[in-house]
Amino acid sequence: MSQLEDYVKTIETLKKEYREDITIFLALEMEYFPGIFEPTIEEIRQYPMDYLLLAQHFFYENESFHGTRFGWADEAHLKMYVELLTTALDTGYFNMVGHPDIMNYTGDDALYTKYMKQLADRLKQECIPIEINVNGFREGYNYPDKKFVKLGVENGNEFIVGVDAHNPDEYHDLASYKGCVKMAEDFGLSLIHI
């Protein structure tokens, strides 16, 4: 959190400098861990965030962290992931969810549909679009997951393509961006733009 104040000052300066050219939003991506959420959010609430993006890369179990992107075949971990995101959304602080389909569930398709439909329903209820993630597409990860996109389409969710650039060069990866747009178009989606 020591860099948060500098980050906010930088974004606020850039907002003023480029206000005639582009709209710049103040945003932060974070994970949700119940045991440390309150002190973390108290720090963040001091700043005028436009977007607070939930991106759950890990879950905490048996006193250790486990990556959500690594293959999980059991119902318990899938349920834990969806419940963790739902609990995070219950806080009312998050207005975006990054790669909600990051959970690499390799088990029964019916269970996947059961739990991920609950997540899609909640995102729809909160008016949070499902992200089609460019970084996952570029890296060949398990997301964006066509099963989840299809489920969201059938559920009537809105969608957005999120760049998720981890360095400035990735922002200019038009081939991966166009691949995600094509995926959306293949499902008959019209994307929202922020």
Residue locations for each model-derived region?
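Residue-level marker for buried hydrophobic side chains located in beta-strands
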Residues: 26, 96, 159-161
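Helix C-cap/helix->beta junction micro-motif
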Residues: 18-20, 125-126, 155, 187
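Conserved small/polar residues in nucleotide/adenosyl-binding loops
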Residues: 192-194
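Short acidic/histidine-rich active-site segments
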Residues: 157-172
